[in-house]
Amino acid sequence: MHNDSNSGAPGTPSGRIRRRRGSNEVPPEVVKANGNHLLVNDRSKYKSMLIRAYSSVWMIGGFAFIIYMGHLYIWAMVVVIQIFMAKELFNLLRRAHEDRHLPGFRLLNWHFFFTAMLFVYGRMLSQRLVNTVTLDKFLYKLVGRFVKYHMVTCYFFYIAGFMWFILTLKKKMYKYQFSQYAWTHMILIVVFTQSAFTVANIFEGIFWFLLPASLIVINDIAAYFFGFFFGRTPLIKLSPKKTWEGFIGASITTIISAFLLANMFGRFQWLTCPRKDLSTGWLDCDPGPLFKPEYFTLPEWFPAWFLSREIAVLPVQWHALLLGLFASIIAPFGGFFASGFKRAFKIKDFGDSIPGHGGMTDRMDCQMVMAVFAYIYHQSFIVPQNLSIEMILDQIILNLTFEEQLAVYKKLGQIIQERTFGES
């Protein structure tokens, strides 16, 4: 229904009555993104676009520099992002009045956070840490002890936090404290599930981190610009500013970009080689069949102005198309979920750490969904399912002492010698 603005005189009570908007209605500030109005016609939106573009340029530049620095620096970047996300989410349900009566309660949240960090990264990177110190006997034994007792150490850290929480319980504050305890654990699950898969992708080869992350960025930028200049039709009520024009335009752009970026990234060993230790040196490896070009001859009807009748395609580019399809169709639902979450708590953004973009969590909503899919896809369709020599050696180095490894070496030599004499 549409109320006539002239139906009541300004001086009458009826003229002062304000109609209450329904919860599922499109807010007036975003109506111009739909119907017959375009955001491009709203001059006030250009300032917001410029701020957003300026922040994006700085983020992309910093991201490119960290990629150049290598695996460890990318991991450090992920840790920093985790800390920002946790801070934003911890603050979401905080109430200043209750916190004043609970000194040290915030510190307890961070105790659980760093305990979770030690557990997740300790399990994920223990083998690479062992590979890094193999040549130093003292460090090798020290790291071996850490790996052996890692789980029990993390358990006692957690139990210490659990006891700390119980001892801080105060009368009339139980409900608030238990809600914060549950909220903290939910945050840890969300943040560390995403980051664990992200870090695993990094050490499998920067390619498997960089391509999915880049596709989300491209999809986000393309959706913004297609929606800004052409958006008319609302896509979903949870995000009234999202339009079908932006969604479709971004999907096409993302899928094409996936095919082209895979070809570009796949030609650099720095991006394709997995990192087996925690060093920062240059990588040199056999890229494998996925990153070796295959040549295709274009048909005769292809336009004559094309530079060559033969094109080189990396097999990984076909996999990239599926990643691009997921990034453009499925991953945006992570953003829709975040939009619904923010509406539930009546907030515009999770934070304000990135001008024009909101908080770090606002930038990571789709990335979380994409990182998990990229890891599962890589493990299911890219990594060989049979045991490799490297995997067997990793298990020997990780689980056996130096004396046991020496015994395996002698026994293996004996078996090979017996087989050699038997064949002769």
Curated annotation (Swiss-Prot):
Region (Disordered): 1-29
InterPro entries registered for this protein in UniProt: PC_trans, PC_Trfase_euk
Family: Belongs to the CDS family.
Cellular component, GO annotation: endoplasmic reticulum membrane
Keywords: Lipid biosynthesis, Lipid metabolism, Magnesium, Membrane, Nucleotidyltransferase, Phospholipid biosynthesis, Phospholipid metabolism, Transferase, Transmembrane, Transmembrane helix
Function: May be involved in the synthesis of minor phospholipids and in modulation of IP3-mediated signal transduction.
Pathway: Phospholipid metabolism; CDP-diacylglycerol biosynthesis; CDP-diacylglycerol from sn-glycerol 3-phosphate: step 3/3
Tissue: Roots and sink leaves.
Topology within the bilayer: Multi-pass membrane protein
GO BP annotations, alphabetical order: CDP-diacylglycerol biosynthetic process
Primary location: membrane
Name used for this protein in its record: Phosphatidate cytidylyltransferase 1
Localization, UniProt: Membrane
Cofactor note: Requires a divalent cation for activity.
The protein's Enzyme Commission number: 2.7.7.41
One family name in Pfam for this protein: CTP_transf_1
Residues annotated as transmembrane: 60-80, 102-122, 149-169, 183-203, 206-226, 246-266, 321-341, 369-389
Reactions accelerated catalytically: a 1,2-diacyl-sn-glycero-3-phosphate + CTP + H(+) = a CDP-1,2-diacyl-sn-glycerol + diphosphate
Cofactor: Mg(2+)
GO molecular function (one): phosphatidate cytidylyltransferase activity
